[in-house]
């Protein structure tokens, strides 16, 4: 492949920061503007920049973040792609000042079917989140048969690697909560 075509492909397939659907202070008082500025503006931006510098001229050039996460071996490309995917899903899942605090419709039905109740789901999800040693993510995902699963993923891993579709992610890396909650992960 010639250099011009390679350059054009890399320009087209650059990974970008997601646009937040809320203001940086829109999640207060639960998540402060300082945390959003730091977590979104510094951490996620660094993962995006790293991924854009690592992928060109590799077998992953031209692939989506999901494809990279599903197929890349452990290492720098996987770690940065995983964190871009995880953080993108994380930041886009929030709604400032929601008027409902419980799921409804098909999601509520699936939670009741697979966990017995929303309360049971919350207990299991919180246990996964607080029980993960070190850094990582807790996820609610769905498999190809529609069954819900709670998983704990170390570091930058994602349920996509196991063929699951993530629905809800909770970042338990300290940078996600330390400015607001210090060492109180369970809060």
What is the predicted function of each stretch?
Residues 1-7:
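Sec-dependent signal peptide recognition
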Residues 9-187:
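Feature for soluble, non-membrane regions of globular proteins
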């Amino acid at each position: 492949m010639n250099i011009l075509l390679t350059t054009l492909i890399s320009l087209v397939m650059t990974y970008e920061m997601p646009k937040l659907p809320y203001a940086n202070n829109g999640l207060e008082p639960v998540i402060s503007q300082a945390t959003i500025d730091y977590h979104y503006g510094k951490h996620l931006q660094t993962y995006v920049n790293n991924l854009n510098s690592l992928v060109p001229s590799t077998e992953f050039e031209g692939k989506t973040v999901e494809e990279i996460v599903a197929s890349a071996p452990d290492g720098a490309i996987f770690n940065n792609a995983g964190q871009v995917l995880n953080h993108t899903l994380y930041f886009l899942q929030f709604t400032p000042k929601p008027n409902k605090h419980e799921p409804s419709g098909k999601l509520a039905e699936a939670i009741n079917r697979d966990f017995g109740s929303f309360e049971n789901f919350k207990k299991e999800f919180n246990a996964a989140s607080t029980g993960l040693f070190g850094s990582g993510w807790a996820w609610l995902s769905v498999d190809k048969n529609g069954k819900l699963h709670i998983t704990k993923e170390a570091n930058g891993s994602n349920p996509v690697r196991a063929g699951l579709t993530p629905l809800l992610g909770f970042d338990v890396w300290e940078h996600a909560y330390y400015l607001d909650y210090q060492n109180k992960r369970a809060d």
